[in-house]
A protein has these predicted regions:
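Active-site proximal loop and beta-alpha junction motif in alpha/beta enzyme cores
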Residues: 3-143, 150-199
C-alpha cells in the first residue's frame, strides 16, 4: 500500500545515497511514482506516492450488511466500499476510538469474499479525518496508506471534506490530495538496517 511504498522509496533513495529522489515502482495495481524530499530531521524524509484511481469496491455477500453484523457496528452511520488495488470498507462513526476493532473488523470483513480492509472514520476537523484500521490478513494496524486514501475519497464524495485531507491514524498522520494525480504524502524514517539470512 501507500505507507509501504513511502518506506520503500525512502530505503531505495538511502541505498543510492540520495536524500531526495524520484522512483517508479511496479505494483500489482500499476506503476506508482514516488517522490522523496528531505526534512530538517536527518533520518526522516517526506515521501509522496501517486496512488492511482479509487474505484467502487466489492459487494458484500448479504443484502443489509449493518443489520447482518448487528451490535458491533451499531455506531456506523453509513458505509461504502472502495478499491484502489485492494478492497476497503469505509464506515462513518462519531468516535472511532469507541469501536472494538477486534470484534467489528472481522465481523464486517467476513462478508466480503476476498476479505477487505475495514476503516472506522470520523470527521475530526475541517478537512481532517480520524481513522482506525482493521486490515485483512493483519488485524488491527496503526496506519494504512491505501485506507487513508479511500477514506478521504469517500468522505469527499459525501461532501464532508475538501480536496486536501489530513488523515490522523494511531501510527501517524498523512496528507491525501484528491487532485490529479491522487497522492498520499507522509513521513518515512530510517529505523535500522537489517540483514536477512537465506532460508
Amino acid at each position: 500500500g501507500g505507507s509501504g511504498l513511502r518506506c520503500f522509496a525512502r530505503a531505495v533513495g538511502r541505498q543510492r545515497g540520495q536524500i531526495e529522489s524520484r522512483i517508479n515502482v511496479s505494483t500489482p495495481a500499476g506503476i506508482r511514482a514516488c517522490v522523496v524530499r528531505s526534512t530538517e530531521a536527518q533520518e526522516t524524509v517526506v515521501a509522496t506516492v501517486e496512488m492511482g484511481i479509487v474505484r467502487p469496491g466489492p459487494e458484500p455477500d448479504v443484502h443489509n450488511l449493518l443489520a447482518e453484523v448487528g451490535a458491533p457496528v451499531a455506531a456506523v452511520k453509513r458505509w461504502e466500499t472502495a478499491d484502489i488495488g485492494n478492497p476497503h470498507v469505509v464506515c462513518e462513526v462519531d468516535e472511532p476510538e469507541a469501536i472494538d476493532l477486534l470484534v467489528a473488523g472481522p465481523a464486517v470483513e467476513s462478508h466480503f469474499r476476498e476479505g477487505a480492509n475495514v476503516h472506522f472514520v470520523a470527521v475530526s476537523g475541517r478537512d481532517e479525518l480520524s481513522v482506525r484500521v482493521w486490515e485483512r490478513g493483519a488485524g488491527v494496524t496503526n496506519a494504512c496508506g491505501t485506507g487513508a486514501t479511500v477514506a478521504a475519497d469517500v468522505f469527499h464524495r459525501w461532501g464532508r471534506v475538501g480536496q486536501q485531507v489530513v488523515v490522523h491514524m494511531p501510527g501517524g498522520n498523512a496528507l491525501v490530495d484528491l487532485g490529479t494525480p491522487l497522492t498520499l504524502t507522509g513521513p518515512a524514517t530510517h529505523v535500522a538496517d537489517l540483514l536477512v539470512a537465506d532460508a
